[in-house]
């Protein structure tokens, strides 16, 4: 069974309990890495300046404590494999639904099951709703 690294565990611990519950279940089935949980002001604004996020601090879901968002990708990481990211997200979304956790994925912001209609794709991004 896959396990999180120490770093992934630390990042996940900075997240909302619902995200912790969800991704602690996901890791039992699919090997994945927690790339980011809570973000500092400096980190959020740096990512904004690099065009990797659309909002400055404190307007991001990563900026609350605990974080309402986390960035997670299947392991090993392959940024070029869009299909793998989408398949992983489908598993996560299904798992969340079965657990009664409402989330939104950065590969389908409007959650209409159309992944080609986004102006900004953020495939590793998952956030709790409500």
Residue ranges of predicted features:
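Glycine-rich, flexible loop/turn motifs
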Residues: 8, 43, 122
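Catalytic cores and adjacent binding grooves of peptidoglycan-active enzymes
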Residues: 13, 59-130
């Amino acid at each position: 069974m896959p396990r999180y690294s120490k770093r992934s565990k630390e990042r996940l611990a900075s997240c909302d309990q619902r995200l912790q519950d969800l991704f602690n279940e996901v890791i039992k089935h699919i090997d994945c890495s927690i790339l980011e949980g809570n973000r500092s002001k400096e980190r959020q604004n740096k990512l904004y300046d690099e065009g990797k996020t659309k909002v400055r601090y404190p307007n991001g879901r990563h900026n609350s404590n605990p974080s309402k968002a986390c960035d997670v990708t299947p392991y090993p990481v392959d940024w070029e494999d869009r299909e793998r990211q989408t398949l992983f997200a489908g598993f996560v979304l299904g798992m969340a639904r079965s657990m009664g956790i409402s989330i939104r994925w950065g590969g389908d912001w409007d959650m209409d099951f159309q992944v080609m209609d986004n102006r900004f794709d953020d495939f590793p991004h998952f956030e709790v709703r409500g």
